[in-house]
Regions:
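Nucleotidyltransferase catalytic core that binds NTPs
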Residues: 1-173
Length: 173
């Protein structure tokens, strides 16, 4: 793999999420990553198709189209102080938010798949031979420890393909 391709993978951070619904907490985490990893040029939100292979997730969630629309709307408004309280607070403090339409994208890849898609399978489809950086919540990391949800092969693939950036979530320690 060429040096420029390697640099490109390291300057992109992937963020898998169900977005049920997407909110400021998701965008604030992406914003925090941009501040903490200034070499990051792109945050890619990997929107779930909602068909979880997780046997413990039985909750009905809004349609993919609605979740996509909410995420797009939230991203469009995020850095505008007239539409976003975090942007207004940042502006009043003399700071400009870094997350913008120009450095974020929403992957529709999983939405085209009409079956449960394992996270490891999804990662493998775009990671190639270089590790990619991925934001994961502590809740997802906790689920990775459950063999009903993630197989040993899944974990090997995730370890091979990713540098995980762990974020606190809910009451998971």
């Amino acid at each position: 793999m060429s040096s420029s391709t390697t640099e490109s993978k390291l300057s992109t951070i992937y963020y898998p999420l169900t977005a049920n619904p997407a909110g400021h907490h998701h965008l604030l985490l992406a914003e925090s990553v941009l501040w903490n990893f200034p070499e990051t040029q792109l945050v890619v939100f990997l929107l779930s198709n909602g068909l979880h292979p997780d046997p413990l997730k039985q909750q009905q969630i809004p349609s993919a189209a609605l979740r996509l629309n909410i995420l797009q709307s939230a991203l469009n408004d995020w850095s505008d102080p007239k539409k976003s309280l975090p942007a207004k607070i940042a502006e009043d403090s003399g700071i400009h938010l870094k997350l913008r339409k120009s450095n974020s994208a929403i992957s529709h890849r999983e939405l085209a798949i009409n079956r449960p898609l394992r996270l490891a399978e999804h990662i493998k489809s775009f990671s190639g031979s270089e590790k990619v950086r991925m934001i994961v919540g502590a809740d997802l990391l906790e689920r990775m420890l459950n063999p009903q949800i993630f197989t040993d092969l899944d974990l090997v693939e995730i370890e091979r393909s990713c540098h995980l950036l762990l974020a606190p979530r809910n009451e998971v320690e």
